[in-house]
Amino acid sequence: MVDDENRRRGLLGRRSHARSWLPVKPRRILATAGSFTILVLRALITHDIPRLAASLAYTSLLALVPLIAIALAILAAFPGFGDERERMVAWIIETFVPYRRTEILDQVEHFVGAAAGLTALGVAGLTLTAIILLLTIESSLNAIFRVEKSRHPLARLLVYWSVLTGGPLLMGLSFSLSSYLVAIRHLVGTDVMSPFDALTPTLGPPLLSLTAMTLLYMLVPNRPVPLFHALAGALVATLASALLRSAFLMVITRGLSYETLYGALAALPAFLVWMYLSWAVVLMGAVTAAEIPNWKMARRLTRAGQDERAARLRIAVEIMVAAARAYGEGQGDGASRRALSALTATPDRRQAGVLRDLDKAGLLIRDEDGAVLPGRDPRRITLAEILHALTLAPPTGTVGGPGWPDLLRHALETAGGDYDRALGLSLDALVQAEPLGARI
């Protein structure tokens, strides 16, 4: 009997272990994907993505020729890249323009050739147009990622200069390496693979788009963006771009005939529509990357049974306590933005909203780098004022119950369950709370 019971328990244990390795239920996967999709759709509406895409498409139409002209001028300064200039332009048009490529390539080459004869003032105008495009891209992504403070003008200048000079040089180097390896293969008679031989017409554009958009989402916004978040947004944008490309070609070649409406000018409106749709996809990927932290935070709050009110109160108290500690320790610079992010473990959007409310109420002050200090003596700042700054009503239930964040429980229990006394606790008293001090 004992052996049978042991065998039965062992079998049940193995079954339980096997069940733990089974995939998540499809219903749960669909619910998770659905909740994230709804969050992204709301963010697309909030940020007015159609308007941003239209602005970028119009600016890109003006800046396309200046950008290519600047890139070719930079390559012309290096004799080794002379043979790669035409190949680079043709490859860009072939990769990213799905409709009437030959006409668009001819027009671009004509405009670039005309730009080569411009005076110094004309070159300055071309450069300014290219910089305006980069400014528009940066401001759009900063808005999507909720960046409150833009880069310093000098930092912007360095970033833009790096993009305008480094991008063409890297592309020229890639094409030169490709030509060099192809020449070796023909000379030696062996199958030396060129990097561009491996990037077939099917895989090349998606891989390039995935890499470029990942770097775009990581480097352009003036805030840290995790690689996984940027890669996820880039993957969404790349897949959407591939689907959009097929749909666009089907509509443009079968459904709507631009030649009938515009005749010889048909390439221009089609190209403008394609640029608008392409920027809409790029911005959608940026919104996806920006909303991942907020979605993860919402899931954690749901699992912990903590509502939005308690989460905002927790963030506000952690920020105020960190500022008070910096003040008490004589740190003139205050609690840094990086320290606050690590302390609250909160997405920038949620933290920025709380900081804005506290700043507006005069409870803290912020410097240009985002560091914070109390707006006045911590002994004169009460929990009730923090609640009022966040426009929150006092939590219901017993002190330390579900409405109160865990980190406040010890400090609030010192009030003996008296709400009035609890809400009158000063920021200095919260700093002195043992569990709070241990956590922070």
Curated annotation (Swiss-Prot):
Subcellular location: Cell inner membrane
Transmembrane spans: 29-49, 61-81, 117-137, 157-177, 201-221, 224-244, 264-284
Recorded superkingdom: Bacteria
Main location: membrane
Membrane topology designation: Multi-pass membrane protein
UniProt keyword Cytoplasm, yes or no: no
Record InterPro entries: UPF0761_bac, Virul_fac_BrkB, WH-like_DNA-bd_sf
Cellular component GO terms, alphabetical: plasma membrane
Key words, A-Z: Cell inner membrane, Cell membrane, Membrane, Transmembrane, Transmembrane helix
Keyword tRNA-binding: no
Family: Belongs to the UPF0761 family.
Name of the featured protein: UPF0761 membrane protein Rru_A2625
